[in-house]
Amino acid sequence: MAEENKNNENFQYIVRIANKDLNGERPLKLALADLKGIGLRLSETIAKKLDLDPDQRIGELGEDKIEELRKYIEGKVYDGIPYWMYNHRRDITTGKDFNLVSNDLDLQINDDINLMKKMRSYKGIRHERGLKVRGQRMRSNGRKGLAIGVVRKKEEKK
């Protein structure tokens, strides 16, 4: 496999997309799935939308194809992909659907949690207190902190 790469002068061992270095030897669908915010199914859909082979190694793509892929992923709205595949639907402020990648996704999630805390919603209060948010049981599971053992009294020698 390494010999095949050496024969191709244009092969890129590292491809940078959305501020992340991707391994050029991995197939396109698996390399894109390494990005936070893009799963395997979305990566296959993006590859088909851009007329790329999902099983082709990402390092074998030409510079123009990689640039096209980079612009498509870093743009928040993907043309031709259904809204239900996006990871951020019905934004609170704009009401639009879009897909966020890497740091943008982390920042948006933190902003949403802080907004819930500020509004004093039920979920926000649970986030503030560090409790479970989605209705899970609390009696026996989800305990945090170290267990404090029982201290026994020292027995007196007779």
Curated annotation (Swiss-Prot):
PROSITE patterns: RIBOSOMAL_S13_1, RIBOSOMAL_S13_2. Keywords: Ribonucleoprotein, Ribosomal protein, RNA-binding, rRNA-binding. InterPro entries: Rbsml_uS13_C, Ribosomal_uS13, Ribosomal_uS13-like_H2TH, Ribosomal_uS13_archaeal, Ribosomal_uS13_CS. Coiled coil: none annotated. Pfam families: Ribosomal_S13 (PF00416). Gene3D superfamilies: 1.10.8.50, 30s ribosomal protein s13, domain 2. It comes from the Archaea. One of its GO terms (cellular component) is small ribosomal subunit. GO terms for biological process: translation. One of its GO terms (molecular function) is rRNA binding. SUPFAM superfamilies: S13-like H2TH domain. Part of the 30S ribosomal subunit. Forms a loose heterodimer with protein S19. Forms two bridges to the 50S subunit in the 70S ribosome. NCBIfam families: PRK04053.1, uS13_arch. Located at the top of the head of the 30S subunit, it contacts several helices of the 16S rRNA. In the 70S ribosome it contacts the 23S rRNA (bridge B1a) and protein L5 of the 50S subunit (bridge B1b), connecting the 2 subunits; these bridges are implicated in subunit movement. Belongs to the universal ribosomal protein uS13 family. This is Small ribosomal subunit protein uS13.
